[in-house]
Amino acid sequence: MIKPLEKERRPISSTFESETRQPFDLSDDLKARVDALGLAETVQHAKEEGYGYIYDAAPMEFIEHLKEAIYRNAEGFEGPRGSNMLLTKDPIFAEAVLNPKLLTIVEILCGKGAMLSQLSSTIIPKRTDSPRKGGLHADQNWTPAPFPVHNQTITLCWACVDYTPEGGSTRVIPNSHLLRRHPTSEEVAEEAGVISTECPAGTIVFWNGSIWHGGGTRTIEGERVVLHTTFSRMAMRPIENYDFLGEEWLADKPYEMRVLLGREDFLNKDGTRANLDKVTQTMNWAKT
């Protein structure tokens, strides 16, 4: 089992922060966590290129169990398939969301209080017709350009099989996040500068909300099996709604799960007055 960052409830802040941290200006606590988890090179790559890899994210036994759960919950039995709203469909999905390395990258790219936006899977078989082209986009599709300086979303994909060009890995255009806009139709068609991500099974490949990327074409036998985890800043509406999960379901979950589901901020609740204890914390998280 992958241990969460910590299970104790953190104290609510009572002091408003006046300054907003700029992207990749990490607090001492966050720097220490990055170093302890061996993520320094990963963070630097993400800062420069807009995407990155979390290697050895979990033991291969975990990856195999994750892969089995993806197949077991997929809709359909052949061809491209997958599933959405996976959080409650197998305990291993919640464990994947709470991975300490993953959550550290999420905090760096989307700040404290980031919410789980979507948890889905895809199973992509070998393509027998022409190679896939087009489909380049930025995941901040519902954010107008120019994109904010602070990243709004992050997608992290658990690669349950090797990620290779011939295996249909996600394709990205490095540094495209610096443009802070959506690609034009001409840029989507041309795909100038596109590369395929490459990493072994057991890696989490991720990109920020501004990077231009798209799916690849699998030209070899077998299937590409991936768990997609998307997070957003707490001010954004998530894609999937887990409001139906009550305190009974959350009772044995760590504090981090409450944060990811928006239970520790005052937004989308029954008014500010009823949640005064969380107002300051929410405002401070928004500045990270």
Residue ranges and their predicted role:
Residues 115, 150-152, 221-223:
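A short, structural micro-pattern
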Residues 119-121, 156-158, 227-231:
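A structural signal for short, well-ordered beta-strand segments
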Residues 53-54, 156, 205-207:
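Short hydrophobic-aromatic micro-motifs
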Residues 2-147:
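Non-heme Fe(II)-dependent double-stranded beta-helix
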Residues 59-61, 123-124, 141, 163-165, ...:
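Short, solvent-exposed loop/turn segments at secondary-structure junctions
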Residues 131-198, 236-245:
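Catalytic core of non-heme Fe(II) oxygenases with the double-stranded beta-helix
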Residues 2, 179-211, 216-288:
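Conserved double-stranded beta-helix
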